[in-house]
A protein has these predicted regions:
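Positively charged n-region of N-terminal signal peptides that target proteins for export
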Residues: 1-4
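C-terminal motif of bacterial Sec signal peptides marking the signal peptidase cleavage site
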Residues: 15-16
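Tryptophan-anchored aromatic micro-motifs
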Residues: 24-50
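Edge beta-strand at a domain terminus
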Residues: 25-29, 36, 79-95, 126-148
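Flexible, membrane-facing loop/turn or short amphipathic-helix motifs
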Residues: 36-46, 71-78, 105-112, 133, ...
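N-terminal glycine/threonine-rich, aromatic-flanked beta-hairpin/loop signature
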Residues: 46-84
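Short, solvent-exposed coil/turn segments at beta-strand boundaries
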Residues: 57-64, 90-93, 119-130
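Contiguous, well-ordered beta-strand patches that form the walls/edges
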Residues: 70-120
Length: 148
């Protein structure tokens, strides 16, 4: 019941975002990776297919993660564009690994402090992207294939 309530709250929180809101402004793309994949919310079994995600290496230490038209629950009335900024990363050849904790995500250019991103970890290889994290107390897993 608590998990259903969490998803309803998430849906209500993000319902204020316009369906036709402009995509978030992406910082200068020194190096960027875009993937198309699936977001899974393990606690409910909800999946969002064909989710476009972009990771931009902002500088030598930080990257930003952009998720476009994302939903976290079937009851969520609209999709949102979301940004997780200033994520520390390490690049070793073609492998990029990143991690973070206590990062406030933005949706519709507004901070959502109630859904702080915790236990963020991910990787980008030559052909795939993986992201695992919690939004508040809701775990999520994203797996995608890099666009060539």
């Amino acid at each position: 019941m608590k998990k259903i309530f969490t998803f309803i709250v998430l849906a209500g929180l993000f319902a204020s975002c316009s369906i036709n809101s402009p995509e978030p402004e992406i910082k200068d793309e020194t190096e960027a990776y875009e993937a198309l994949g699936t977001l899974l919310i393990p606690s409910s079994g909800f999946t969002k297919e064909n989710l476009r995600t972009k990771v931009v290496l902002v500088d030598q230490e930080k990257l930003d993660i952009y998720m476009f038209e994302v939903k976290f629950a079937a009851l969520m009335p609209v999709t949102i564009d979301m940004v997780i900024s200033d994520v520390p990363y390490v690049k070793n050849g073609s492998l990029i690994t990143f991690y973070g904790d206590s990062i406030v995500p933005y949706a519709g250019n507004k901070p959502y402090e109630k859904y702080i991103v915790t236990e963020l970890e991910g990787s980008i290889t030559a052909d795939s992207m993986f992201i695992s994290n919690n939004y508040g107390d809701t775990p999520s897993i994203y797996r995608g294939a890099l666009k060539q």
